[in-house]
Amino acid sequence: MGRRPARCYRQIKGKPYPKSRYCRGVPDPKIRIYDVGMKRKGVDEFPFCVHLVSWEKENVSSEALEAARIACNKYMVKSAGKDAFHLRIRVHPFHVLRINKMLSCAGADRLQTGMRGAFGKALGTCARVAIGQVLLSVRCKDAHGHHAQEALRRAKFKFPGRQKIIVSRKWGFTKFNRADFTKLRQEKRVVPDGVNAKFLSCHGPLANRQPGSAFLPAHY
């Protein structure tokens, strides 16, 4: 018996059903890598960021996530280079899908009980996605921004429903706007922390603050 199409499980029905000690025998998700490209590049290297945002409430299978990751990564490597971007998958397939197998051969009515005890067994996994939730994010240099948008456009065909490609106003994967980040960086109020940035607030002991930054305005 082949794999049941994901269109049968597209609608979100009922509660989340994650893998647990009560839900055993779940197949591993097809997607195993969630960060692709130069994931160790600092926050200053890639200022441009673009998101692929879901515009429907639905289930997205792990096979679709893996197919989108491969399509996006392949185009970015070919067009921008393997050292010029960082791709991140923003959803994880924790929801377990079930199937109540039915026999279709001759004499099947003697072997099975129909809809009696029809809870089903684990078939695969999917991610429960809400409206406005980010599916994929790519950060890169400004010169490769159009390549990143085209890569996400190609990845969009791997998903059901509707998605939108939104260019972020933030600096990379941080929570700061680009203008604010540049200003705070000049004032030395943000410290690079991997792909993110740590904000130095005006709270805490005076002895731990740098000279000249003891009494900063608290509107940030």
Curated annotation (Swiss-Prot):
Subcellular location(s) of the protein: Cytoplasm; Nucleus
Entry keywords, A to Z: Cytoplasm, Nucleus, Phosphoprotein, Plant defense, Ribonucleoprotein, Ribosomal protein
Disruption phenotype: No visible phenotype, when heterozygous. Lethality in the female gametophyte, when homozygous. Enhanced susceptibility to geminivirus infection.
A GO CC annotation given for this chain: nucleus
Modification note: Phosphorylated by NIK1 and NIK2 in vitro.
Tissues/organs with expression: Ubiquitous, with the highest expression in flowers. Expressed in seedlings, leaves, roots, stems and flowers. Expressed in young leaves, mostly in dividing cells and in the hydathodes, in the root tips and lateral root primordia, in pistils, anthers, and pollen grains, and in developing seeds.
A Pfam family per the record: Ribosomal_L16
Functional description taken from the UniProt entry: Ribosomal protein involved in translational regulation. Contribute to general translation under UV-B stress. Involved in the NIK1-mediated defense response to geminivirus infection. Acts coordinately with LIMYB as a transcriptional repressor.
Assembly, per entry: Component of the small ribosomal subunit. Mature ribosomes consist of a small (40S) and a large (60S) subunit. The 40S subunit contains about 33 different proteins and 1 molecule of RNA (18S). The 60S subunit contains about 49 different proteins and 3 molecules of RNA (25S, 5.8S and 5S). Interacts with NIK1. Interacts with LIMYB.
Additional free-text comment from the UniProt record: Under UV-B conditions, RPL10 proteins interact with several nuclear proteins, including RBG7 (glycine-rich RNA binding protein), which has an important role in mediating innate immune response to pathogens, and BTR1 that specifically binds to tomato mosaic virus (ToMV) genomic RNA and inhibits the local spread of virus.
The protein's name: Large ribosomal subunit protein uL16z
Gene: RPL10A
